[in-house]
Amino acid sequence: MSKIAAAFKKQRKCFIPFITAGDPNLDVTEQLIVAMANAGADIVELGIPFSDPVAEGEVIQAANIRALSAGTTTDKIFAMLKNVRTKTDVPLVFLTYINPIFTYGTEKFLANCQSVGLDGIIVPDVPFEEKAPLAELCRKYGVDLIPLVAPTSDERIKMIAKDAEGYVYIVSSLGVTGVRSDITTDIAAMTEKIRQATDVPAAVGFGIATPEQAEEMAAVSDGAIVGSAVVKIVGKYGTDCVQPVSDYVKEMAEAVHKVQ
């Protein structure tokens, strides 16, 4: 059983925070991963900074710029993760675009994921129809290729879910990432369609910021993913962000974990 599958089995409802690697610097990223795991995060998503992150709103775009300005590279992220793995075995997932993977060398990238104990990757700009070569290499190196499912036709939702590994990332609303005041998509109906097609868990992301929203989303799926709200705290506190992020993650994880 993969570590991601084990996390959902153990917790039933998972809380999954996202941060951009290298924002404000990689030392702080390392501390954040460990602190978030200790605060109750079941899985941690890490963004690889990229100059053109098409699915991201302004909060995460700004984090990408800060991380790149701090000299963050993919090699330095892998080196940092080696250290992380001496401190925590929390499942780790990269959220990245195909360009940084392709530029790095797809096979080399996935071999390095395997060697640092990275558990999954999410690549928003690779459509389902074009994922076969990447999926094959992911399987070769034991890395789950986690699909994004947006509010779309029943057939498409089921087609993507049927092939899913790790978890299905349900995009709660169309558009870019960011905090929403309310989420209007019928998540329960989407989860139901996904469950008809696969046993792989489904977690909801895009726009969750409060414990109430996280609890609400966990009630109709298998977990809540929170990115922009965490990255906002990192942006506000800079190198002093570890404690405030940890406090926020603890509150959010408690809200998700109390859902039965």
Predicted features along the sequence, with ranges:
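Glycine-rich beta-to-alpha transition loops that act as phosphate-gripper elements at the mouths
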Residues: 20-25, 95-103, 127-128, 148-152, ...
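Catalytic cores of alpha/beta
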Residues: 26-36, 152-162, 204, 208-224
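Active-site beta->alpha loop and helix N-cap motifs at the rims of alpha/beta catalytic domains
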Residues: 48, 59-123, 256
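Alpha/beta catalytic cores of nucleotide-metabolism and tRNA/nucleoside-modifying enzymes
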Residues: 77, 192-200, 209-260
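Glycine-rich phosphate-binding active-site loops on the catalytic face of alpha/beta enzymes
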Residues: 41-52, 118-122, 127-130, 172-178, ...
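N-terminal amphipathic alpha-helix/helix-capping segment at the start of soluble metabolic enzymes
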Residues: 1-18, 82-86, 260
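Hydrophobic faces of well-ordered beta-strands that scaffold small-molecule active sites
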Residues: 15-19, 44-46, 92-96, 121-123, ...
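Active-site-adjacent beta->alpha loops and helix N-cap segments on the catalytic face
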Residues: 1-7, 52-60, 72-82, 102-108, ...
